[in-house]
């Protein structure tokens, strides 16, 4: 599973050092549910600089909202998650 997690992150995520934010394209969320769940949890943990991952129930809800386009901007695990067109931008909460 770790191989698929890393491949999903490598192929579908761009890190901007100047803004310290991640840009996630739409293909990221078209992977199997477990791969999306684990890799998105890992990204939030990295950007939010947390030791523990976020709660699964909250993460499931956010992934569903992203897939159905019912999201504008929200926070989870010290990160701001916003959807712009077909991409999701993940940045650290100040």
Which positions does each model-derived feature cover?
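AMP-forming adenylation/ATP pyrophosphatase catalytic core
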Residues: 1-94
């Amino acid at each position: 599973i770790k191989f698929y997690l890393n491949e999903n992150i490598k192929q579908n995520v761009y890190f901007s050092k100047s803004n310290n934010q991640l840009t996630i394209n739409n293909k990221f969320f078209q992977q199997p549910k477990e791969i999306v769940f684990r890799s998105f949890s890992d990204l939030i943990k990295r950007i939010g600089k947390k030791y523990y991952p976020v709660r699964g129930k909250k993460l499931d809800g956010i992934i569903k909202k992203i897939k159905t386009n019912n999201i504008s901007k929200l926070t989870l695990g010290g990160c701001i998650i916003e959807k712009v067109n077909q991409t999701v931008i993940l940045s650290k909460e100040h």
